Amino acid sequence: MTSNTTEIPYHFLPYVRIQYDWQLAYKQDSDNCWVAYQKDLKNTIHGSVHSTKIDENNFKFESDYGFKLTPNKENKNNIRVENDKYSIEIYAPEKQLKVSGGKKRITSMGVSHLGELGVYGSTDGTLEVFETGDGQIRRKLDGHVGDVDLAMFFPSGRVILSGSSDSRLKIWDAIEGTCASTLVGHIGGITSASLVDRGRNLVSCSRDGTSKLWDIPTSSIISNLTKLSRPINDSFIASSLLDSIPTTTTTNSNDNNKVDEREVGTDGKTLIIAAEEGFLQAIDLRSKNMISQMNVVQSGEKSTRSVAFNACHVHKNYIIGGDHNGSIYFWDKRNLNSPFCRLQFTNSPIHHIKANSSNSKIANSIWVTSGDGCCFLLDLDKNQIITSLSGIDTDVVTSFNIVGNQAYLTSRDSIIRCYNNLLNI
């Protein structure tokens, strides 16, 4: 079934940004930086901030044009900024880890579920496993060629999955630093991968327009799930999604077909993919059937638009897609005929949509990153940006990870930015 829409409710999300290195004010008796309030896409209020050291533990921040800045006395990396009845919590990195002496550019990163180990991939085809506490390198993983665009841990925290522009995926022992297997089958660079259950099976997506279901123990392809004419940019595997989708949306059911004995945990799972062609697709992992293709037709248009979707996610009853023009579309998974909402805070591409911490005080919230260096926490009940992670100066966010009340950001440089004690997660 192909979905479309003629009218989509639109909400612009105002936000405040402050100079990326604002926290350096604490190292000087006085300092100046800039602050900006984006009221909508065309109107921005620019202000300047002057900081003054009162004593060893207290600083005063003064500004113009209606800005009010309130530093957190218990956490110098946190400051609240207000303007025009709008308020946002902004965090600076607690620490910044510079990898390989600043000689490498980070293209991807993952963190273990306990937050003790991290792994980053770079443009030279290598990955390095490091301790998140001090940045000490534990293992170097060498075997890819070209940019490593995927780096993630399995739930055990002992196994790493990587994918590169060389079209291959690799499974690594994070402790020993050895490559356990290589998955070969794509003919374009790897863009995304999602584990099925605990990780006996996985789904990979590529610039070749295909998504594949793999059996990891045998390094073999179980099924070719999709074949598009342009790249697949992101993927997400959801559980229990099929229970909410009307049965009429599923076509050409293969329920009577014999299930491949290599499949583990695919029953009840749905794959969501974000396509360069400008749509999302939902695919039943067990039957391999497409459940729905979620297109966007703007009011007054006669055909679907072709703006690329770069990111996708499933949150509560929402299927969410972020596109190349900065729009974030929401579908109700019980009705995929059309998006029920479009949010926007930038014209830059949306690159990541992630769940908030499972222990969050703000349950109905998601993290979103963009190509101009923004990393925001969105409160979906209020349609409001409530938290911002500073530290990247208008460059693309290449990876975002959240573990507990900690977050990790990377850009196209050699710095891993680590944030701690975030209030809203």
Curated annotation (Swiss-Prot):
**KW Repeat (keyword) present:** yes
Provide the residue intervals of the WD repeats. 101-140, 143-182, 185-224, 299-341, 345-382
Q: Which GO terms describe its cellular component?
A: proteasome complex
Keywords of the record: Proteasome, Repeat, WD repeat
Q: Which Pfam families match?
A: WD40
Q: Does this entry carry the keyword Metal-binding?
A: no
Q: Which residues cross the membrane?
A: none
Q: What does this protein do?
A: Inhibits proteasome 26S assembly and activity by impairing the association of the 19S regulatory complex with the 20S core.
- What family does the entry list? Belongs to the WD repeat PAAF1/RPN14 family.
Note the subunit structure. Interacts with proteasome 26S subunit ATPases.
Question: What is this protein identified as?
Answer: Probable proteasomal ATPase-associated factor 1
| Species | Dictyostelium discoideum
Q: Which gene encodes it?
A: paaf1
